[in-house]
Amino acid sequence: MTLWINGDWVTGQGALRVKRNPVSGEVLWQGNDADAAQVGQACRAARAAFPRWARLSFGDRQVRVERFAGLLESNKAELTAIIARETGKPRWEAATEVTAMINKIAISIKAYHVRTGEQRSEMPDGAASLRHRPHGVLAVFGPYNFPGHLPNGHIVPALLAGNTIIFKPSELTPWSGDAVMRLWQQAGLPPGVLNLVQGGRATGQALSALEDLDGLLFTGSANTGYQLHRQLSGQPEKILALEMGGNNPLIIDEVADIDAAVHLTIQSAFVTAGQRCTCARRLFLKSGTQGDAFLARLVAVSQRLTPGTWDDEPQPFIGGLISEQAAQQVVTAWQELEAMGGRTLLAPRLLQAGTSLLTPGIIEMTGVTGLPDEEVFGPLLRVWRYDTFDEAIRMANNTRFGLSCGLVSPEREKFDQLLLEARAGIVNWNKPLTGAASTAPFGGIGASGNHRPSAWYAADYCAWPMASLESDSLTLPATLNPGLDFSDEVVR
């Protein structure tokens, strides 16, 4: 039984789904998808549970969410292993994901009070109050690259605000979704407050098509996000939060410490095997001998990166991609770029057929035109050379995406210029693109999202503001507007 609906584990009535380790091929999880009828059942359960859950005090909801945080802590090793085995990422990185899930709880509680709590302003004849109310039933679509942390970033603030939820994990990470749901079950959520439906495209389409849905919170690819946006167009009554991908630029200016800059670039481009939405996809490098030296060092260090299994000792920097198909898509993208005129500096290689272990690739595209503006979700970095900083910014902004952007430079003035001109929701200076602060917004503009960033700002899209003018008594004003007569004279 792999679906959690209205407080019970049930068997899916859809197609059989089998999840294997992307490196070893070991079967990790299997179960049936939810069909459309079961998606509808989950929605009805969430709707029935909503009034009581929303009427609980914030403190009562907080107790259950904090209980979940405690369960994450006590089950950290087990959940780390599940995420690592299912995604292919090394144990060390999966452990940081579970830690981020735990830390998200306290941050979300604080964010609720700061961003969506209650405020009261006294007036001469009463008061003006601001409160926030939950939307109702929300669907949460999870991605596969961080199958615990990223859905958690929607689920936790949504529950704290008083919403009820239908959660669909990525079809590529059903085991992680299952494991997290079982911890929520132990946390004692009332039946129907959080429901789990497993499945792929058919399940997702059934979920997003539900009429009795008050909103949808999505993290994933731009293509799927665009489909959801089109599907929900003309329905302003539904909140839609989209956090999508990016064709992210990293600009390398003057560099005092080449190894430090190379380390930052590798952290930006190749961590998580390039499967972070904020990963650097495009590297803009200043022309000249220093740029040449940097590029040579980047290639030399990158070719030492050998992907390994999740439990290898010593631990590798990167593991496998989510699937062999995903790894092959990166290789195909590199071959297409090479055919268009790109100069390969480091060729990506599948270490073994039947696995997703892929080495990083670097290809120079200077002077090549007509390139597709698409995100290649893996360890493939494209390089361009530039002459002036203005040219670098123009090239960096030449994308429909707008998630992250970065600059390596000792000059604050250049960063100030980038802050004014960059088209991105995250703009970093001498920091990896993949770094983020949980107390700052996380999200982008353009094809990267719809201006509803997650992290600290997730509270904003999980509740709507309610304004009130209030007085505990009613009296006739001493001064009336023109034309109003409340005298005792009888009008004849």
Swiss-Prot record:
PROSITE patterns (alphabetical): ALDEHYDE_DEHYDR_CYS, ALDEHYDE_DEHYDR_GLU
Gene name of the encoded protein: astD
Protein name from the UniProt record: N-succinylglutamate 5-semialdehyde dehydrogenase
PANTHER family hit by this protein: ALDEHYDE DEHYDROGENASE-RELATED (PTHR11699)
Keyword NAD: yes
Major enzyme class: oxidoreductase
Family: Belongs to the aldehyde dehydrogenase family. AstD subfamily.
Pathway connected to this protein: Amino-acid degradation; L-arginine degradation via AST pathway; L-glutamate and succinate from L-arginine: step 4/5
